[in-house]
Amino acid sequence: MWDGFSNSFWSRDYITGINRAQRLINEGVEQNEKLLQLLHIRAKSASSCSDLLFKSFSKFNKHHPLNEESNDLPSDAAIHQLYESYLMEASLHKKLGEQLNILVINPFANWSKKYSRRVDEIVSAAIVKINNYNSRFSHVNSKKSNLTDRKPIPTSRKSNKSDSLASALSQLDINPSNVNKFDGLINIVDHPYTAEEFANVLLKLMKASTVKRKSYSHLGDYELVTNCSLLFEAIKTTFGLEKDSYVVKAGNQLIQHGLIRLLGIRRVFENDPEIDAQFTTKSQQLLKSYHLSILEVDPYFQVNDPITATNDDPVLQKYNLAYDNLEQCRHELELYLFMVFKDLEQAELDRLNAVKSVLVECSNYSGNFIPSLNSIFIDNLNSFKNLDSLRDMSTQINKHYTGYFIPVSNNELSTKDEYLFLQKSSLTEDNLIVSLVPKILAYLLDAYSYERDEEVLSCVWTTEVPLKDAFDLKSVLRKTDNVESVLNACVEKYTLSSITCSLRLCLLEFPDSLIRSSFYDYFKAIYTTYTDFEDLDHRLYSIKKCLLHLHSTPLHILEEIIRHLSAYAISIRMKDGQIRHLAKIISPCVLRPPDDLNIIPVEDTHPTLLVIDLINEFENLFADLERPSTPPVEIERALTPITTSPQKLKLPRSSSPCKNPSPTRRFRPF
């Protein structure tokens, strides 16, 4: 199935896709030159043949004058007639050459020059836009480099939405009004403590951790700071824990209770001397409630929180502004490139149609002027009329294909040690998308029943809509909690296809696909080996094995989407071709290649095949699936791409339908 230029020439760096599209266009320009040269040769040969015939007949007539009055014999008259026919043929050759130049060659040559200028202007403007984006990216990257010594980095940017933090806290089961209160017992590694008992334990823990004031450039001074390595040993001795796994568990429980926070992007406690931790306001208030304190003076409450302090720091404000400009530039660039690819596609289609017209016209003129060769030109004419411009373009696209559209993520602006440099896709925004997906699916499910046109209903997910409309609707949806009322208010402006497209954009903006990109080569090997219908059990076993490794959040979203698409496909009685088209559109959300893969091979159809199996075999795959439990504190980590392979899944060997060694051993991420 062919998607045209707009979904075939995307790359992570943008410029590679543009260069491939330009290479295709340049091959078309070379084809124009080749055709013009051939037509020039034909016209020149016709004129040369005419000149040669006239010159030769003049010499013949000088030595053997032919006069109708002397044609007494029938044979002389026949020879004279032959001479006249040759003269007529010479004049026809001359006229053919002139007509080819006037009616075919010159117009096509002028059109080719305009075509070359047209595509050059389109590509040049796109390259200027890309260079502008790259310069902005370098500017932001240089600002990031100037802040590399700054720790901690804020874990999220201030959201434009006033209640977004409350939304995130609600998903983490944290009530802001009760954030500094303890009700009942405090359990740490299955040991219950009363609030007073735990206050004394917490004081010992602070002293053992050697907490101190620490200064961070551009952020100021912070009290009660220690590194995770010292804190690890302090927890081990204070709570009397022997196993390191219990120490890690205790540290994570302290984080969940809001007594400790890790400074940076980390959300899971571990024995790492490079990561700093801070005892929070809640822990200090717990000590004060029992007249305990580790600080002689209590300046802690006057220290700005790193999240809110960011907004008052001039250096970080400049970084915020530069980052916002970069994201705005990226947004505009992707919209512009869609238009560029559409223009290039139309230009190439116009060129192929022009070539077809030139070939047909040339055959028409040649056949009319030279009756003796008319049968040959008729055959050529029939062949030229059957030329399929779209098929030629599809072949060229497959030859130069770079990949389908995936919005570029600027997650690389974070440092190598994973400290977050004001990353745009923060935990709060990701949680908004997580809550947004089921609401949109529920609205669509209700909207299907009101659509009476079956043809429109069957194309809700596959109809192409302007990318700008989808971006605008996505922005509106992410700023509201009442999705249904917003969609009802926008029903006249946005179609159901715009809603589905905006939903796909939300999913594409996740740092990783719903099935982690580390499984990309694994599924490629699966669908390269098990291609027959008889291999369905092998594929389903491999898919289910992968699903067991997913975090609960992306697994829940994946299940909701596949359940919706499966019911949608059944309700409108989708055929295999329609399901394949639907799967190809949704596949980048489900499984996409790793970030280091700049060009996606056109042969990589396994994400589409995977989605087809998920839709067709939904009940078999998700019915008895054991969901892994993901603690609320790990939601951000669940939505963050990983570079390490998941641990090997321990399943009974007898449950596998594969009797022979699996061909995916080298790709298997388990």
Swiss-Prot record:
Compartments in which it is found: Cytoplasm
Biased composition (Polar residues): 641-663
UniProt-annotated site: Arginine finger, residues: T462
Short name of any one Pfam family annotated for the protein: RhoGAP
Residue numbers of Phosphoserine PTMs: S645
Record has Phosphoprotein as a keyword: yes
Region of interest: Disordered: 141-161, 641-670
Domain Rho-GAP, residue spans: 425-622
BP GO terms, sorted: cytoskeleton organization; small GTPase-mediated signal transduction
UniProt modified residues of type Phosphothreonine: T640
UniProt xrefs under PROSITE patterns: F_BAR, RHOGAP
Domain F-BAR: 3-392
Entry keyword set: Coiled coil, Cytoplasm, GTPase activation, Phosphoprotein
Annotated InterPro entries: AH/BAR_dom_sf, F_BAR, Rho_GTPase_activation_prot, RhoGAP_dom
GO molecular function: GTPase activator activity
Cysteine-cysteine disulfides: none
Secretion signal, residue range per the UniProt entry: none
GO cellular component: cell cortex; cell division site; cytoplasm; division septum
The protein, known as: Probable Rho-GTPase-activating protein 9
Organism: Schizosaccharomyces pombe (strain 972 / ATCC 24843) (Fission yeast)
Gene: rga9
